[in-house]
């Protein structure tokens, strides 16, 4: 049941004790004045509020950006590294031609010269561009900066610091099998 009546009556105020009447009107009594004034109160409150708002903003930003970044960056593929792998069919690399295959985590270019297969890394050691086989010149050529390699992956000319990594390639039946050299 709700109470009704005058809560600021003189009889009620006197029963509450000394100083109750002025305090109920909004004034603070019985306290001593603050030595530094009210400057510190505002700045402490503002600093606290800035930290709270900043913290909430950071939580919102992280909770929003995390799924976006997770979506954009693909998960690391876990490729089982093997010493030997069947990568394709022999008919895919006719005489005088080449083809790039995936071997473990590496790209390997296989060249067929008169039925003999040669395999080296297809990634130029200069800046990581893919090399091409030029049968007329009997060499690999990197279109990015003009690096040239022999059939075995050795350096002919260009800015590359290292030769191409060598692999072993052979044909069994109609399958091309690449293995680590």
Curated annotation (Swiss-Prot):
It comes from Chlorobaculum thiosulfatiphilum. This is Cytochrome b6-f complex iron-sulfur subunit. Its EC number is 7.1.1.6. Binds 1 [2Fe-2S] cluster per subunit. The Rieske protein is a high potential 2Fe-2S protein. SUPFAM superfamilies: ISP domain. Keywords: 2Fe-2S, Cell inner membrane, Cell membrane, Disulfide bond, Electron transport, Iron, Iron-sulfur, Membrane, Metal-binding, Translocase, Transmembrane, Transmembrane helix, Transport. It is an enzyme of class 7 (translocase). Its main location: membrane. InterPro entries: Rieske_2Fe-2S, Rieske_2Fe-2S_sf, Rieske_Fe-S_prot, Rieske_Fe-S_prot_C. It catalyses: 2 oxidized [plastocyanin] + a plastoquinol + 2 H(+)(in) = 2 reduced [plastocyanin] + a plastoquinone + 4 H(+)(out). Belongs to the Rieske iron-sulfur protein family. It is a multi-pass membrane protein. Its cofactor is [2Fe-2S] cluster. One of its GO terms (cellular component) is plasma membrane. Disulfide bonds join 129-144. Residues 85-178 form the Rieske domain. It is found in: Cell inner membrane.
């Amino acid at each position: 049941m709700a109470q009704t009546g005058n809560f600021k009556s003189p009889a009620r105020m006197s029963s509450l004790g000394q100083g109750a009447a002025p305090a109920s009107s909004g004034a603070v009594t019985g306290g001593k004045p603050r030595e530094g004034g009210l400057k510190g109160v505002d700045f402490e409150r503002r600093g606290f509020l800035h930290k709270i708002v900043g913290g909430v903003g950071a939580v919102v930003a992280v909770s929003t950006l995390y799924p976006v970044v997770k979506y954009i960056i693909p998960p690391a593929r876990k490729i089982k590294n093997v010493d030997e792998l069947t990568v394709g069919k022999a008919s895919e690399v006719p005489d005088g031609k080449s083809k790039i295959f995936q071997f473990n985590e590496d790209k390997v270019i296989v060249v067929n010269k008169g039925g003999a297969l040669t395999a080296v890394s297809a990634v130029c050691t200069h800046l990581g561009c893919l090399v091409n086989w030029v049968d007329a010149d009997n060499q690999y050529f990197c279109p990015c900066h003009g690096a040239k390699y022999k059939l075995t992956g050795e350096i002919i000319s260009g800015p590359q610091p290292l030769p191409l990594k060598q692999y072993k390639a052979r044909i069994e039946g109609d399958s091309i099998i690449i293995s680590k050299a």
